[in-house]
Amino acid sequence: MGKPKLLDTWPEFSRYWNQACSKSVEEQTTLWRTLYMEKYPELLSKQLQTYEEDGLDWKEIAKKIFPSFSSRFPQMQKARDNIIRIYKSIYSKAAETLKLHFNITFVVYVGIGCGAGWATTYKEQPAILLGLENIAEEKWHTQQKLKGLISHEIGHLAHMAWREEWQMFEQAEKDPVFQLYSEGFAQRCEHIILGKETWHLAENKKWLSWCKQHKSWLAKEFLRRIEKQMMVKDFFGSWFNIQGRKQTGYFLGHEFIRMLEETRSLREIALLKVDNVRKLGLQYLNALSNKTFE
């Protein structure tokens, strides 16, 4: 079994924010980079590159995020404290249930909105980047929500490790069908690790029942966007929604994985070739979109 490691940048963020909290958002943005994030060059580079690839100016994004830092500071602090309390036990559960044999670095930081959880590599090792600003925004600072989030991201890392793909895997997720498969796989792993269906990303108690009732419609809408080469980001991520419901793509992907589990092991599902993922994913969506649910 590998080991969990922690890189906690919260003390550095707190020192930066003590100096920057009363300044203009433009100054806060500059100081975030120079006083805080430049101490972690790879972490900085990953965030900036994410927005560059989408043709966005990270400073403009930061201007929308930084004004909430003061009001969300207590939730960010609680999230950081809870992560420290639980990350080792969640890693142990994941190692036992998924038979993991690699180290994971958990990076706790305050960034520019690149996600509450981000499964990737850091210093050439498997890593989970935990963005406190997004965690606080989603109100995922409780231990229950964080256990789900961390388990979900470990699921992504297990998937990458079994496929022996890291950067290539993140690039493959740009295809909407592969993203559906990837997020569904991670969501299934979350439930396996925690021993029950936790759905940490459900925004309220009605979310799951709505998704089940609208499963056919969700599949049809996802297919329509693929066919018209439209973005599917409304199905994923905390800033987007479908008919007012966020994160519905995770449910749709989870159902895809559950269907595949009827004839395959989890590892066999993890190792499906990209072309086969797309073929099976489209078959699943087409079949589902022609069904009606009460």
Question: Model-found features: residue ranges?
Answer:
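Soluble non-cytosolic domains of exported or imported proteins
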Residues: 81-85, 180, 247, 251
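Hydrophobic, aromatic-lined core segments that form the binding pocket/scaffold
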Residues: 130-133, 158
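Post-HExxH zinc-binding segment in Zn-dependent metallohydrolases
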Residues: 2-24, 28, 170-213, 286-291
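N-terminal low-structure segments adjacent to metalloprotease catalytic domains
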Residues: 1-67, 74, 78-80
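Active-site recognition of the HExxH zinc-binding catalytic motif
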Residues: 145-164, 183-187
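Pan-zinc metallopeptidase signature
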Residues: 211, 217-294
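Short pre-active-site segment immediately N-terminal to the catalytic Zn-binding motif
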Residues: 134-150, 177
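Auxiliary, metal-adjacent structural segments of Zn-dependent hydrolase domains
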Residues: 68-127, 139-143
